[in-house]
Amino acid sequence: MKLSADLKAFEGRIGHQFREPERLLRAVTHSSLSSVTRSDNQRLEFLGDRVLGLVMAEALLAADRAASEGQLAPRFNALVRKETCAAVAREVALGDVLKLGRSEMMSGGRRKEALLGDALEAVIAAVYLDAGFEAARQLVLRLWGARIAQVERDARDAKTALQEWAQARGLPPPTYEAVDRSGPDHAPIFTVEVRLGNGETDRAAAGTKRVAEQAAARALLARMEARHD
């Protein structure tokens, strides 16, 4: 088959020309558009998640040969989580070439973090099946680029770090509450409040509750650590 102009341009952006173009088409096809004659990208996403994990594990081990498993695990999680995958997907304009059903398209599917992250994992799997592990490894290293070297030495997610801070001071785990929702249905903004057992609170807003919780925890932890330094 012959790829459309937009998919050919996408090949250029990711630096891989598919020997079997059908693999790329499947990788960018969401389940909202799948049919008997058109497969979606869910199985590719499953495989791509594992390929990405192996590439990142190898890269982190090579980057810091003295790090323990306990130090490497949070760095790994920071590099493979959906928010990171979605950010990488945006950098190569993956959303522009996604094949979506009408309802998913109307609800802003091209901008959804989960959908973008899943599709990027599917693309990684498509490259793996098309040209082997080394091609997939080079793709991941190329797309993630400096993120691997710059991942924080202590890359625990903010909610975990805040909970550990609280427990070390005899406080119960922080609580999180969604206190507001604004914006249109296809691009909502959630405001989340985090509260510590000592009465300290902070708020943050983001496009998903998960990201808002992380941002609120990060802000409160920074304030608490600055106050107790």
From Swiss-Prot:
Q: Tell me the GO BP annotations in alphabetical order.
A: mRNA processing; regulation of gene expression; rRNA processing; tRNA processing
Q: Where are the catalytic residues? A: 49, 121
Swiss-Prot/TrEMBL catalytic activity: Endonucleolytic cleavage to 5'-phosphomonoester
| UniProt keywords, alphabetically | Cytoplasm, Endonuclease, Hydrolase, Magnesium, Metal-binding, mRNA processing, Nuclease, RNA-binding, rRNA processing, rRNA-binding, tRNA processing
**GO cellular component terms listed in the entry, alphabetical order:** cytoplasm
Q: Which organism is it from?
A: Cereibacter sphaeroides (strain ATCC 17023 / DSM 158 / JCM 6121 / CCUG 31486 / LMG 2827 / NBRC 12203 / NCIMB 8253 / ATH 2.4.1.) (Rhodobacter sphaeroides)
- Pinpoint the DRBM domain residues: 157-226
This entry's Enzyme Commission designation comes to 3.1.26.3
**Name the UniProt record assigns to this protein:** Ribonuclease 3
Subunit comment for this entry?
Answer: Homodimer.
* Function field: Digests double-stranded RNA. Involved in the processing of primary rRNA transcript to yield the immediate precursors to the large and small rRNAs (23S and 16S). Processes some mRNAs, and tRNAs when they are encoded in the rRNA operon. Processes pre-crRNA and tracrRNA of type II CRISPR loci if present in the organism.
Q: What family is reported?
A: Belongs to the ribonuclease III family.
